[in-house]
Curated annotation (Swiss-Prot):
InterPro entries: Znf_C2H2_sf (IPR036236), Znf_C2H2_type (IPR013087). Binds chromatin; requires N-terminal regions to form protein-protein contacts, in addition to DNA specific recognition by the zinc fingers. It holds the Pfam family zf-C2H2. The keyword Phosphoprotein does not apply. This is Serendipity locus protein beta. Disulfide bonds: none annotated.
Length: 356
């Protein structure tokens, strides 16, 4: 009798259901790289095609290995970029200033995750007298324009910068979301007390520890086929993770912001800010020294001070002798000179009705 227990697609071992996750839609936390793309690359290493089915799953141990593989390859990419920058930086053509296009290309020399540079022997072209500079410039352009890929491009994969295949040199912390320039700096940050103390929630799918339940709620997008730059509850998208969390407060409606003066609670930070501004206006009211009138905002207070200025500008009314200190007040005053249209009475309406 055959076993009905699920098995891992990577290691082939049978395990309990709770330790598995479907490979389809599974993404590496932080980089948004699909796990199935990593496995496709390993087809070339083992020289064998891997038949991924919709119900193919991987155990947590193997997923952790794949996550670590992604981290190691990104470290290799950063080191390779530093070496490439050093090689190009010390080989600038003498007597020629570097153009903006060349500088931009040199800054982009890097190898994204899961991509390997294939070393090929370059045959040095024969140079004619006086063509040294042109030949060196040509070799630089060839090197900078070369694409480093390990597989054929897939038309089904998104290519726009706003989609989650965007390649970036910054690495986000999976606990607090802060961005770092290298894996080494990120690991130092994670080991620091400030980051470790913020671990309060754990994903029950991949075991990832994050800052709190709100960050965990956003992290679940990765297991549901979305990115961490999209709202989990609506179709809105944002450019930064912190903006998504700020927007999702509308859906949570937890009223976690409380006024320390009156105890009123709010679900959005800007609502409490406006509320605190009203408290501040009441406690630190602006009083006119001339007439002792009280104002709640600086705008109305400054507007009132103009009425006491002897050299204040005046805006006279063309229909009467009155003048005003600002154009808006004059505009409101002009309405008194406009004829008021009286509403037509019911009797008049009946008199104008024509019967056919």
């Amino acid at each position: 009798m055959s076993s009905t227990r699920p098995f891992c697609f990577v290691c082939g071992k049978e395990k309990s259901v709770g330790v598995f996750q479907l490979i389809e839609g599974c993404i590496v936390p932080g980089t948004f790289k699909p796990i199935k793309d990593i496995l496709k690359y390993f087809e070339k290493i083992i020289n064998q095609r891997l038949e991924l089915l919709p119900n193919s799953a991987a155990c947590r141990d193997c997923l952790e290995y794949l996550f670590n593989y992604d981290r190691l390859v990104r470290n290799l990419s950063q080191v390779q970029r530093q070496i490439a920058d050093a090689l190009l930086g010390c080989r600038q053509v003498e007597g020629k200033a570097e153009t903006k296009q060349q500088a931009a290309k040199r800054a982009r020399v890097q190898v994204p995750a899961f991509k390997i540079v294939q070393a090929t022997a370059l045959k040095e072209p024969e140079r004619q007298p006086g063509e040294e500079d042109e030949c060196e410039e040509f070799m630089k352009e060839e090197m900078l324009d070369e694409e480093f890929q390990f597989s054929e491009p897939d038309d089904s994969m998104p290519s726009s910068e706003e989609e989650f295949f965007t390649e970036t040199t910054e690495i986000p912390c999976h606990i607090c979301g802060e961005m770092f320039s290298s894996q080494e700096v990120l690991e130092r940050h994670i080991k620091a007390d400030t980051c470790q103390k913020s671990e309060q929630a754990t994903c029950n799918v991949c075991g990832l520890k994050v800052k709190d339940d709100e960050v965990l709620d956003l992290h679940m997008n990765l297991h549901e086929g979305k990115t961490e730059l999209e709202c989990r509850y609506c179709d809105k998208k944002f450019s930064h993770k912190r903006n998504v969390l700020r927007h999702m407060e509308v859906h949570w409606d937890k009223k976690k912001y409380q006024c320390d003066k009156c105890g009123e609670r709010f679900s959005l930070s800007w609502l409490m800010y406006n509320h605190l501004m009203r408290h501040d206006a009441e406690e630190n009211a602006l009083i006119c020294e001339v007439c002792h009138q009280q104002f709640k905002t600086k705008r109305t207070y400054k507007h009132h001070l103009r009425t006491h200025q002897t050299d204040r500008p005046r805006y006279p009314c063309p229909d009467c002798e009155k003048s005003f200190v600002d154009k808006y007040t004059l505009k409101v005053h002009k309405r008194v000179h406009q004829p008021v249209e009286k509403p037509e009475s019911a009797e008049a309406k009946e008199a104008t009705v024509t019967f056919f």
